[in-house]
Every structure is written in structure tokens, then in C-alpha cells.
UniProtKB/Swiss-Prot annotation:
Enzyme Commission number(s) from the entry: 4.1.1.37
Subunit structure comment from the entry: Homodimer.
Site (Transition state stabilizer): 78
Similarity comment: family membership: Belongs to the uroporphyrinogen decarboxylase family.
Protein name (database record): Uroporphyrinogen decarboxylase
Any Pfam family: URO-D
Residues the record lists as binding substrate: 28-32, 78, 160, 215, 333
Alphabetical list of CDD domains matching this protein: URO-D
Catalytic activity: uroporphyrinogen III + 4 H(+) = coproporphyrinogen III + 4 CO2
Signal peptide coordinates: none
Gene Ontology CC annotation, any one: cytosol
Upper classification of the organism: Bacteria, Pseudomonadati, Pseudomonadota, Betaproteobacteria, Burkholderiales
Amino acid sequence: MAQTLLNDTFLRALLREPTDYTPIWLMRQAGRYLPEYNATRARAGSFLGLAKQPDYATEVTLQPLERFPLDAAILFSDILTIPDAMGLGLDFAAGEGPKFAHPVRTEADVAKLAVPDIGATLGYVTDAVREIRRALTDGEGRQRVPLIGFSGSPWTLACYMVEGGGSDDFRTVKSMAYARPDLMHRILDVNAQAVAAYLNAQIEAGAQAVMIFDTWGGALADGAYQRFSLDYVRRVLAQLKREHDGARVPAIAFTKGGGLWLEELAATGVDAVGLDWTVNLGRARERVAGRVALQGNLDPTILFAPPEAIRAEARAVLDSYGNHPGHVFNLGHGISQFTPPEHVAELVDEVHRHSRAIRSGAGS
């Protein structure tokens, strides 16, 4: 049965086509701020239990869509699935975040790295993509909203792989980058091949857009960013399938703290660049000059403010971008676990309401 996408506003915005309103989705929209997510996680037994069981991953992916009229779903997974598939032993200790049992620190460690067999080691992710697509689609083949697949960037994955987990200063991975750039580039080369294969597998399974999260690119100095992060994002994009089932599959790249390098990110071959809240969206639109769409960029902590303040800040973001195609509203980073869900409802409503007013000429 041929499928019909009932709401393709998000995909059209990524391709800089005119839309009736500005689409919105939120990084970490399926997460701990939702009571129903916490209930499902308790049933699954752990975070990895959620991520590695397609039925649970599907359930939590759809939860925010049941609450809010969001314009896209994003696969529930984790950016560290690739290094886990490489055999580094991922674990999430309570209250401590991700940890790897076998960090990559030595020449021997690097020599053991290989691109994982995606089907054999990450089939649970592609199974989840297929199951989510089915769950988004009714009996007549009508799909509610598009599904986004994603991966961490080669550099961001390397940060966790070398540090063995999160870090305040990334001194271990940055020391390797400067002292042994040959080792760093070998890690990044394997990671880039793996990320491209992983995203292509998600596209083949049904992801209708993909996003590369370069969460720690902004930890690098200018110059080092280009060598160790941007160049490898470019390599991933060059290997991506950009069409599937006769439709364009847009790609988004997001470097947290990457506003300085906006023009360079826009020249990588992406369809859209994600922005954090430190960037003026109107000036960013002028800087990219219509070459790419922009995604962002409300400060997530604004969602702790009173509803009218949330609405005012949402209007400010929309007004900054103006009545132009090519904007997807999002936060500048992931939503906090402490965010009141009712405040998210206020945000989504205001983005839809005010962007329609802007299109009609009634907004500022």
C-alpha cells in the first residue's frame, strides 16, 4: 500500500519550501520530563532496555506526539550505540551517565577498532525505525508526521570513546588529538565510515530525515574544529543516501557551540544547520543566504519561565527569522528532565499560532 504523509511541513521546511506555519519538534522530546516515559522506562528496566527493545523504543517515540501536535517524530535511541557495537562495553550507571568499560586510549586500542556490521550489531535500531513508521501510519496508509533518524558525529563519539564517558574538559581526547593526531584521525576515520553506514541503514529502514549531533564540536578551538570535527561531518554527508523511495531525505547537522562556524557548516552539503541559543537567528539567516535551512534555537531553560514569558520568547525567535522559508523551530539543546510538560504545550501552541500570523501578515 502506498503511504501518504499527512503532515510534511517539517520536510518542506528543511528543503526551504514555503509552509503555512513553522514546524516544531524538540531535541529529547521523548524523555524524562514526561511521566509516561518514566513509567515505560521502569517497565523496560533501564535506559538501554528502552533503547534496545524496538517495542519500547516505539512506545516512547510516540509519547510526545500523543501530548503535543509536534511536526516530526525522532527515533528514540542514544548517540553511543555505535561505539557500543564496536565492543567498548556501554553502561549507564545510575546518576553517573554513560560509561565505557573499554575506552580507546592506546595504539593497540585504536588498531582493534572496526566499522561494526550494522545488521548484526545494530539491528534493534533499524527494527525500531520500521516499527515506528508502522505505528505512525494508519490502516489506510496515512502517516501522521515524518520520522527523523540520527547519529552522533565522529568527533563527539570519539570524545566518549577516548574519555570513557562524559567529561568536563575533554583533556584526554584533546591531548590525544594534539599529541597523537595520527591516532585521532584513525579513530575518526572509522567513526565516519560507521556513522555513514548507520544513518544509511536507518534511511533504508524508513527514516525520512537524518540528523548528526556534534554535541562536543564546540569544545574544540578554531582550526582544531575543522580538522577533527567538521571534516569528518563532511565525509559522512558525502556518503549518505539522499533519496529513498523516490523522496529526498534531508540531512541536518548540529554543532553545539558552533555558531562561529555557521558558514562552514552550511557548506558541508547539509540541508539544514541546527543552532544553539547563543546565535542570533535573523543574522544567521543572512549569513547562510538561503543556502540551507536553519533549525533552532530557543534556550531550553526558558521552559521554566511562566507561560506568557515562554510565548513571548517563542515569538521573538520567530520574529527574528521573519517571514522566510527554511526554518524549523527547536530548542538550542535537549529539553531538561525537569521541564513541566504543560509548558511544552504552551510553546508548541505559540509557535504554530504566531508563525501562521506571520505568514498572513498579521504578525510582527
